[in-house]
């Protein structure tokens, strides 16, 4: 024990030496952070601000509305005198029009599971704002892609409503008609075409899966393996139904997973006080991280605690002591 104490003192002196300090990453000092790891261990609920969660909710509404407006507008611009584009998946698998039902049933299962986890979580106000922000970013990017790039529909059997004009009244009427169906064809038969680039179904499916995998209790984690298989089954069904090209699915998967992972990586970096030195913080939206995370308990962002949940309370107290011994 005496030798360990001497080693700690030597390391502490080395870290604070002027010549050697340049080899260590200096923690951020711009933001105040609550490092009380005992908050979650003791099961106490932190007093968190509600307005960041309401802001994230408003951002979801704007992102979703922008998708509906984009679809209502680009329907007039979809090329209807071209055959479906060549696709590797379409070359090897036949079209099964009813397969979309499988994808949407799976999507509803994942979505309901994710919502239950979010709204019953101990830190629900923080979890909800994180998830909603990721959804808002993903769907805003999709709206941009849909607006700037239109391709022919993937199947000759796809029905598209007759084109009219792009007047404000027509676009507004289409938005009102589509808004509450949430893009689910079981709730509203598909009539408008054009929202192909970046699959909206894929964004929802994989964001819901990641929410469950990240925030579900340990006893429910075996379900995440089943949900992972179901998520890819849903993607396969979307392609069989010819609702999207394969590139739309790939883009949807990439956008949803990268945004979710990047946000949580930045949140962990923020609470580890390495936010300013993290290259991911170069993202134009990274300024939202301090706004959303400054009142979150720090132990929610520890990788071992948050994702693997393999660290016991005893290990947490040891981690807490060892971390503060070097400050």
UniProtKB/Swiss-Prot annotation:
Chief location bin: membrane
Coiled-coil parts of chain: none
Keyword Lipid metabolism: yes
EC number: 2.7.8.-
GO biological process: ceramide biosynthetic process; sphingomyelin biosynthetic process
Positions annotated as active site in the UniProt record: 201, 244, 248
An example Gene Ontology molecular-function term: sphingomyelin synthase activity
Keywords: Lipid metabolism, Membrane, Sphingolipid metabolism, Transferase, Transmembrane, Transmembrane helix
Record-stated family: Belongs to the sphingomyelin synthase family.
Protein name: Sphingomyelin synthase-related 2
Source organism (scientific name): Caenorhabditis elegans
């Amino acid at each position: 024990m005496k030798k360990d104490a001497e080693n700690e003192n030597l390391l502490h002196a080395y870290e604070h030496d002027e010549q050697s300090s340049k080899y260590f990453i200096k923690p951020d000092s711009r933001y105040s952070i609550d490092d009380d790891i005992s908050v979650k261990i003791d099961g106490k609920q932190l007093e968190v601000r509600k307005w960041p969660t309401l802001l994230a909710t408003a951002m979801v509404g704007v992102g979703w509305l922008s998708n509906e407006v984009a679809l209502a507008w680009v329907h007039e611009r979809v090329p209807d005198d071209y055959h479906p584009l060549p696709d590797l998946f379409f070359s090897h698998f036949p079209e099964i029009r009813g397969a979309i039902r499988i994808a949407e049933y799976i999507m509803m299962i994942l979505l309901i599971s994710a919502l239950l986890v979010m709204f019953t979580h101990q830190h629900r106000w923080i979890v909800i704002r994180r998830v909603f922000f990721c959804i808002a970013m993903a769907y805003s990017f999709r709206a941009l892609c849909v607006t700037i790039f239109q391709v022919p529909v993937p199947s000759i059997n796809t029905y598209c409503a007759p084109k009219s004009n792009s007047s404000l009244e027509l676009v507004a009427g289409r938005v009102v008609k589509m808004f509450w169906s949430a893009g689910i064809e079981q709730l509203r038969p598909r009539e408008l075409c054009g929202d192909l680039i970046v699959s909206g179904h894929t964004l929802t499916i994989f964001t819901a899966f990641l929410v469950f995998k990240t925030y579900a209790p340990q006893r429910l984690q075996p379900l995440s393996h089943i949900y992972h298989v179901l998520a890819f089954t849903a993607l396969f069904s979307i392609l069989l139904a010819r609702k999207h090209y394969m590139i739309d699915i790939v883009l949807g998967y990439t956008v949803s997973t990268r945004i979710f992972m990047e946000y949580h990586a930045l949140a962990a970096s923020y609470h580890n006080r390495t936010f300013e030195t993290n290259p991911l913080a170069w993202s134009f939206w990274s300024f939202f991280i301090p706004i959303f995370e400054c009142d979150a308990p720090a132990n929610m962002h520890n990788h071992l605690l948050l994702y693997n949940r393999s660290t016991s309370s005893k290990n947490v107290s040891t981690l807490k002591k060892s971390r503060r011994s070097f400050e």
